[in-house]
């Protein structure tokens, strides 16, 4: 199963200078709890923005450079230069989950393939340079979990 997970403001802001514009401990804890011991797909810049310790996950790191030398952060990392075979393998096996974790171009290319979306909506306004516009017409809002500084919206793909 393919699951995209990200945080954004109500205006669609997802980043600033390759980092999160906010530091909300509860939201980071939600991301950690959701993705721990899971397989993640992310781009090189997203990987480089992770904390020094980011362990107990399998990371498929998308890079044009197949020989990319990544900094070890405590997770198993596999460098790939084409994510479509990976996407297809997880679509064919609904018993295993692959979490799409960014950045912007990875989300834009994969969201329509996802079975579920987990979107943290940050309540406060922030400044930044990366915005994500998502067409949610193919998804149904399944659940909203409210926190003080953000809400987590859980979407599932509409049945065809």
From Swiss-Prot:
Coiled coil: none annotated. InterPro entries: DHFR (IPR012259), DHFR-like_dom_sf (IPR024072), DHFR_CS (IPR017925), DHFR_dom (IPR001796). It comes from the Bacteria. Residues 1-160 form the DHFR domain. NADP(+) binds at residues 6-7, 14-19, 43-46, 62-65, 101-106. SUPFAM superfamilies: Dihydrofolate reductase-like (SSF53597). Signal peptide: none annotated. GO terms for biological process: dihydrofolate metabolic process; folic acid metabolic process; one-carbon metabolic process; tetrahydrofolate biosynthetic process. Pathway: Cofactor biosynthesis; tetrahydrofolate biosynthesis; 5,6,7,8-tetrahydrofolate from 7,8-dihydrofolate: step 1/1. It catalyses: (6S)-5,6,7,8-tetrahydrofolate + NADP(+) = 7,8-dihydrofolate + NADPH + H(+). Gene3D superfamilies: Dihydrofolate Reductase, subunit A. Substrate binds at residues 5-7, 27, 57, 120. Keywords: NADP, One-carbon metabolism, Oxidoreductase. One of its GO terms (molecular function) is NADP binding. It is an enzyme of class 1 (oxidoreductase). Pfam families: DHFR_1 (PF00186). Its EC number is 1.5.1.3. Belongs to the dihydrofolate reductase family. Key enzyme in folate metabolism. Catalyzes an essential reaction for de novo glycine and purine synthesis, and for DNA precursor synthesis. This is Dihydrofolate reductase. The gene is folA.
């Amino acid at each position: 199963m393919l699951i995209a997970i990200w945080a954004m403001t109500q205006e669609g802001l997802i980043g600033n200078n390759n980092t999160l514009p906010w530091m909300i401990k509860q939201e980071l804890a939600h991301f950690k709890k959701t993705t721990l011991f899971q397989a993640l797909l992310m781009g090189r810049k997203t990987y480089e923005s992770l904390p020094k310790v980011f362990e107990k996950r399998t990371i498929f790191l998308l890079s044009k450079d197949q020989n990319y030398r990544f900094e070890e952060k405590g997770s198993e990392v596999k460098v790939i230069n084409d994510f479509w075979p990976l996407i297809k393998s997880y679509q064919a096996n609904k018993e295993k989950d692959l979490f799409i974790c960014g950045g912007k171009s990875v989300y834009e290319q994969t969201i329509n393939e996802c079975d579920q979306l987990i979107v943290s909506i940050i309540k406060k306004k922030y400044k930044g340079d990366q915005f994500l516009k998502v067409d949610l017409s193919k998804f149904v809002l399944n659940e909203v979990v409210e926190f003080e500084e953000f809400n987590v919206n859980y979407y599932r793909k509409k049945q065809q």
